[in-house]
């Protein structure tokens, strides 16, 4: 029997709700068709936003949405996306499929979407091909309430009051598609550009996000922090509130990646092993951040994460459309448990991407919509949002097929909500073994337990023909004991228990 020990009274760090954030890019069917269908569409919508998608995202309590990219951000010129839609400039989306971008979804539409979702806004600015003035004017257009050229332009375009801008990314992947810069050059550009990302509302300031590393480029993290911190007052923390990190699971590597649906046991464990590498990245980048920011004033912002496979057969390679199986449910559960466990440093994360792209929570086909296994994991984990991480540990054993890609059989994280409920989330990575869990809750009287679970065979998925193949089901097989609870977690599953 496996032992899980939980100390509800030993609170460690707040699990920011923003850890459960999402990412939407102008990557063909993510924004267009997936979220925005236009006011004249036969698909039910409110001001052009699909009502089915909006309601589904509200259900999982989407806390924050990042936009417009991604690589698209550093070629996006925001003034092309305001004003009458019939006069907006068209452009070629050179990064994603070479298709025409008509800019019908722009700043006003994004903030309309955030208002419908009830979520915070994370805008990524253009440092790669844009000017300091362009970035400065965008922030002014969005947030300034008084009399100014940009505020007047916003009012002329139909929005009298400014919007609340919570997060602003000063460039994206500037080590790659955002300009192929070296870390010192980018850091100095960051210092210049961020100066003009002005906080016009001290009562709700903009949180500035600096472009961080790709995967394990620890030199980038070190050099960017060194340059930004050596040229400003210590208490300003490099003039940043967050430092980003991007990491994707590519089962077979960057060039081949591998199929989203056709994989064997070896690739299953290899994929989960790569998902677990997120913890190593957080710890090693976090150690460098600790040198310059021991008080953890700068949040680690994992604003692109998830599984990235070879696109579905017959689809445009530049649209990054892929299916979603129980493997993705496990990747999501594993990763979110890691984020929770490191919530002292990880302050926001954004799954890539929200609809129809990469490890999305929703897939659409015309008027039809399905919820992916990943969606259902976010649905179960939503109770961790803004709860307090508590001390917990679980006994594990090593499993797998190939020696190089071994994994622990279980992962977990536990939080206590404001109402006192204890929320336990566990993943069983095994393809063939259930585990009986003896759970000890120290100094805690268990009165009631509710459970829910997502589980199935590794290839199970939701399709437009079978949209409910994978879904959240009640889990009632929990026994109360003198020391806590006892239950058995099935193979290939993600489980949530609420204990009161």
Predicted regions: what is each one?
Residues 1-242, 278-279, 283-311, 315-500:
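Non-catalytic accessory regions flanking glycosidase/transglycosidase catalytic cores in CAZymes
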Residues 249-269, 315:
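Active-site His/acidic residue clusters
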Residues 274:
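Phosphate/diphosphate-binding loops
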């Amino acid at each position: 029997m496996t032992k899980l020990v939980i100390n509800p009274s030993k609170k460690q760090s707040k699990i920011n709700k923003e850890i459960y954030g999402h990412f939407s890019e102008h990557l063909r069917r993510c924004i267009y068709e997936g979220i925005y269908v236009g006011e004249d569409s036969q698909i039910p919508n409110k001001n052009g936003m699909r009502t089915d998608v909006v309601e589904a995202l509200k259900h999982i309590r989407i806390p924050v949405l990042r936009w417009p990219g991604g690589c698209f951000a550093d070629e996006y010129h925001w003034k092309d996306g305001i004003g009458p839609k019939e006069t907006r400039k068209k452009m070629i989306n050179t990064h994603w499929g070479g298709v025409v971008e008509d800019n019908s979804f722009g700043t006003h539409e994004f903030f309309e979407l955030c208002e419908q979702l009830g979520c915070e806004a994370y805008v990524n600015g253009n440092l790669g091909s844009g000017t300091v003035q362009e970035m400065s004017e965008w922030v002014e257009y969005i947030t300034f309430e008084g009399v100014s050229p940009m505020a007047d332009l916003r009012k002329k375009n139909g929005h009298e009051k400014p919007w609340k801008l919570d997060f602003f990314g000063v460039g994206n992947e500037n080590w790659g598609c955002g300009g192929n810069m070296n870390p010192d050059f980018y850091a100095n550009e960051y210092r210049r550009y961020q100066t003009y990302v002005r906080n016009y509302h001290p009562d709700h300031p903009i949180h500035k996000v600096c472009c961080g590393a790709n995967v394990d480029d620890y030199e980038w993290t070190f050099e960017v922090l060194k340059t930004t911190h050596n040229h400003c007052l210590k208490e300003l923390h490099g003039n940043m509130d967050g430092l980003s990190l991007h990491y994707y699971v590519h089962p077979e590597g960057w060039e081949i990646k591998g199929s989203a649906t056709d994989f064997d046991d070896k690739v299953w464990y290899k994929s989960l092993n790569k998902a677990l590498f997120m913890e190593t990245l957080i710890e090693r980048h976090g150690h460098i951040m600790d040198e310059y920011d021991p008080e953890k004033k700068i949040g680690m912002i994992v604003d692109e994460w998830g599984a990235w496979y070879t696109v579905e057969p017959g689809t445009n390679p530049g649209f990054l459309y892929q299916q979603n199986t129980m493997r993705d449910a496990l990747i999501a559960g594993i990763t979110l448990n890691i984020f929770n466990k490191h919530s002292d440093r990880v302050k926001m994360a954004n799954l890539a991407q929200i609809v129809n792209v990469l490890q999305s929570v929703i897939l659409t086909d015309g008027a039809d919509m399905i919820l992916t296994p990943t969606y259902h994991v976010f649905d179960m984990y939503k109770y961790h949002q803004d709860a307090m991480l508590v001390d917990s540990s679980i006994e594990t054993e090593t499993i797998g097929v190939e020696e190089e890609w071994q994994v622990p059989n279980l992962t977990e994280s536990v939080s206590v909500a404001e109402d006192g409920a204890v929320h336990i989330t566990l993943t069983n990575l095994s393809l063939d073994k259930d585990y009986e869990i003896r759970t000890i809750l120290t100094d805690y009287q268990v009165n009631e337990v509710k459970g829910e679970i997502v589980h199935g065979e590794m290839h199970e998925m939701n399709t437009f023909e079978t949209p409910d193949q994978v879904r959240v089901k009640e889990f009632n097989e929990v026994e109360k004991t003198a020391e806590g609870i006892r239950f058995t977690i099935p193979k290939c599953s993600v489980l949530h228990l609420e204990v009161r």
